[in-house]
From Swiss-Prot:
An annotated GO cellular component: phagocytic vesicle membrane
InterPro entries: Cys-rich_flank_reg_C, Leu-rich_rpt, Leu-rich_rpt_typical-subtyp, LRR_dom_sf, TIR_dom, Toll-like_receptor, Toll_tir_struct_dom_sf
Record-given protein name: Toll-like receptor 2
Lineage, opening ranks: Eukaryota, Metazoa, Chordata, Craniata, Vertebrata
Post-translational modification: Ubiquitinated at Lys-754 by PPP1R11, leading to its degradation. Deubiquitinated by USP2.
Annotated crosslink Glycyl lysine isopeptide (Lys-Gly) (interchain with G-Cter in ubiquitin) location: 754
Length: 784
């Protein structure tokens, strides 16, 4: 029994292991190019079965703990390997030995406590290596990177345990585009540890305290282009002039990100600008100034300028003691050489007039996302303020009057570019005043609903996107670029208003079509962006857009952003792919063909009706339907006549002088119905015929050549035919007044023809001796 349980347990383990491997393999998705994605799949190991076809493998954000030398041995063509954000604590020595084509390796944020140079000894083409966020204290006993001659981006260190940097750590590296060192708790920095790197484009240092900052600067100041300091408290920073005063420097840019200053440490940083003379650009991003701006008591007055700094950028500056902050007048003299200033999202509501006047070299000023209003702008743009300013950005402030803002900026004689977007102007006055050299104006997202002559005629670039505009009818003779997306325009602007326009972006309006003629009217247009509109995919529009091979060179967002909105059966399709039927595109031709076909059909029907007496059938059908409304057969008491006599007018002498005399003068007399005598005046003649036939016991047809040719006799014959057909009786009496060919009787009167073929008809004898017998037979036929 125990042996059986043991066997069952072993089989269960094997099955579960197989299922686990199968689940892991299925959780890895690969495309035909060899890019495999296993990101965030809860994997606890590297999936098996990886082959040489894998070129990119993303296994980040899983639960992998171990990398063996067999896991990746078949991935000889692998170029990108992402193993970040796992639980890896062990990597075997030869785990990456077969990855000779690897260019990108990410092992960040794992649990590696020791690093080995053997991991990288075959990675000759590796360009990117990220080792951030692991548990190691140092970069190993030997040089990790000596076998990586092509490495360009290196990220090392962590926020807690990494405490030492030694001289051997970066041996073998000569050029790096980016080096990031996370060393918040750095305690030991051996001098010249970074000096072996001959050139570093961008160095990112995470240092909690600035104790070793100057030592690091001494080593890199001659080989570094950009230094970025992150997450540092500079309260105790002190700059020693002697340390780098005699050295050549190559640093051009300093970035302080999430750094804390005091008044004192800020002065020390300003000193650094003077002694590291190559610095041209300084950026403060998300920094905190724990002071009140009191620099007078410090040595700042002995510093005459900010070195060679030309560009100053400040974003999200936080000043806890903002309401105690002083007027900064002590730093005014330092700003004379600055050409570009950006102070963004820092609650700036005023630039003092005196400071504006000291910024004599300023060419670019960006005060976006602050609290500037017309009242404070009046003080900032005072006389002699910013004398060389060319570009002013006041995006997302508290400006409300377009007219007043333009008037306040008249002091800026050299201003040619103004961005006042994301302010709530709502409307535009009819006239405005602007600096005379204005060439570029940004009024996007200002909620304006119409454009007026307020805009300067000197404009070359105009941005009025994301507003409520429904038309554009301004004449701007010098405008070269127009940005008018996200409005309510229904058509392209008139080209005559914009004679030199070269770039137009008019996407996401309510334009439903445009034509070749419209585009050709913009003679200098090189770039058009008109996607995101609700296009009516008419035949003309599709023919134009699909037939112009050069259209893609003008429409920069063609074809992916151009979709049909109608007709409904192509809605959502790309304009390039939409197809319409022949009837939709050639409606006139189809209608003409249909009309011709209908005409031919009607003509054919007319011929057939004539040939087969269709008109007669329709007339008879109508009359028959009218007659059907009456009683099917007249009751006996409604019979008024013994016989209705149908005859030709030319045979009236025989009927009226012979037949009437013989029948109505006979005893007992017969009552005959004659149309001349008995038809009701004013009544429709067809109704008279129908009523007379129905009120007569018999119908006598006096057949002759004249009868066959008579139109009304035909009607009487027709209705008699219907009566014979409908009532199935023998009410007809045929009298041949003169010999007549049976073929003269129309073929459609089949029953009457049958009567003539199957019954004896009465023939008027020429011989007078036989006429008495004729009348006798006629009287007998009427009585039958």
């Amino acid at each position: 029994m125990p042996r059986a349980l043991w066997t069952a347990w072993v089989w269960a383990v094997i099955i579960l292991s197989t299922e686990g491997a199968s689940d892991q393999a299925s959780s890895l998705s690969c495309d035909p190019t060899g890019v495999c994605d296993g990101h965030s799949r809860s994997l606890n190991s590297i999936p098996s079965g990886l082959t040489a076809g894998v070129k990119s493998l993303d296994l980040s954000n899983n639960e992998i703990t171990y990398v063996s030398n067999r896991d990746l041995q078949r991935c000889v063509n692998l170029k990108t390997l992402r193993l970040g954000a796992n639980e890896i604590h062990t990597v075997e020595e030869d785990s990456f030995f077969h990855l000779r084509n690897l260019e990108y390796l990410d092992l960040s944020y794992n649990r590696l406590s020791n690093l080995s140079s053997s991991w990288f000894r075959s990675l000759y083409v590796l360009k990117f290596l990220n080792l951030l966020g692991n548990l190691y204290k140092t970069l190993g006993e030997t040089s990790l990177f000596s076998h990586l001659p092509n490495l360009r981006t290196l990220k090392v260190g962590n926020s807690n345990s990494f405490t030492e940097i030694h001289e051997k750590d970066f041996t073998g590296l000569t050029f790096l585009e980016e080096l990031e060192i996370s060393a918040q708790n750095l305690q030991i920095y051996v001098p010249k540890s970074l000096k072996s790197i001959q050139n570093i484009s961008h160095l990112i240092l995470h240092l909690k305290q600035p104790v070793l900052l100057v030592d690091i600067l001494v080593d890199i100041v001659s080989s570094l282009d950009c230094l970025e300091l992150r997450d540092t408290n500079l309260h105790t920073f002190h700059f020693s002039e002697a340390s780098i005063s005699e050295m050549s420097t190559s640093v051009k840019k300093l970035i302080f990100r999430n750094v804390q200053f005091t008044d004192e440490s800020f002065v020390e940083v300003v000193k650094l600008f003077n002694y590291v003379s190559g610095i041209l650009e300084v950026e403060f991003d998300d920094c905190t100034h724990d002071g009140i701006g009191d620099f007078r008591a410090l040595s700042l007055d002995r510093i005459r300028h900010l070195g060679n700094v030309e560009t100053l950028t400040i974003r999200k500056l936080h000043i806890p003691q903002f309401f105690l902050f002083q007027d900064l007048s002590s730093i005014y003299p330092l700003t004379g050489k600055v050409k570009r200033v950006t102070i963004e999202n820092s609650k700036v509501f005023l630039v003092p007039c005196l400071l504006s006047q000291h910024l004599k070299s300023l060419e670019y000023l960006d005060l976006s996302e602050n609290l500037m209003s017309e009242e404070t702008l009046k003080n900032s743009a005072c006389k002699d303020a910013w004398p060389f300013l060319q570009t002013l950005v006041l995006r997302q402030n508290r400006l409300k009057s377009l007219e007043k803002x333009g008037e306040l900026l008249l002091t800026l004689e050299n201003l040619n570019s103004l961005d006042i977007s994301k302010n709530n102007f709502l409307s535009m006055p009819e006239t405005c005043q602007w600096p005379g050299k204005m060439k570029q104006l940004n009024l996007s997202s200002t909620r304006i609903h119409s454009l007026t002559q307020c805009l300067p005629q000197t404009l070359e670039i105009l941005d009025v996107s994301n507003n409520n505009l429904d038309s554009f009818s301004l004449i701007l003779p010098q405008l070269k670029e127009l940005y008018i997306s996200r409005n309510k325009l229904k058509t392209l602007p008139d080209a005559s208003f914009l004679p030199v326009l070269x770039v137009m972006r008019i996407s996401r309006n309510i334009i439903n079509t445009f034509s070749k003629e419209q585009l050709d009217s913009f003679q200098q247009l090189k770039t058009l962006e008109a996607g995101g509109n609700n296009f009516i995919c008419s035949c003309d529009f599709l023919s134009f857009t699909q037939g112009q091979q050069a259209l893609g060179r003008v429409l920069v967002d063609w074809p992916d952003d151009y979709h049909c909105d109608s007709p409904s059966h192509v809605r959502g399709q790309r304009v390039q792919d939409a197809r319409l039927s022949l009837s939709e595109c050639h409606r006139a031709a189809v209608v003409s063909a249909a009309c011709c076909a209908l005409f031919l059909l009607l003509l054919l029907m007319g011929v057939l009706c004539h040939r087969f007496h269709g008109l007669w059938y329709m007339k008879m059908m109508w009359a028959w339907l009218q007659a059907k409304r009456k009683p099917r057969k007249a009751p006996r008491r409604d019979i008024c006549y013994d016989a209705f006599v149908s005859y030709s007018e030319r045979d009236s002498y025989w009927v009226e002088n012979l037949m009437v005399q013989e029948l109505e003068q006979f005893n007992p007399p017969f009552k005959l119905c004659l149309h001349k005598r008995d038809f009701i005046p004013g009544k429709w003649i067809i109704d008279n015929i129908i009523d007379s036939i129905e009120k007569s016991h018999k119908t006598i047809f006096v057949l002759s050549e004249n009868f066959v040719k008579s139109e009304w006799c035909k009607y009487e014959l027709d209705f008699s035919h219907f009566r014979l057909f409908d009532e199935n009786n023998d009410a007809a009496i045929l009298i041949l007044l003169e010999p007549i060919d049976k073929k003269a009787i129309p073929q459609r009167f089949c029953k009457l023809r049958k009567i003539m073929n199957t019954k004896t008809y009465l023939e008027w004898p020429v011989d007078e001796t036989q006429q008495e017998g004729f009348w006798l037979n006629l009287r007998a036929a009427i009585r039958s």
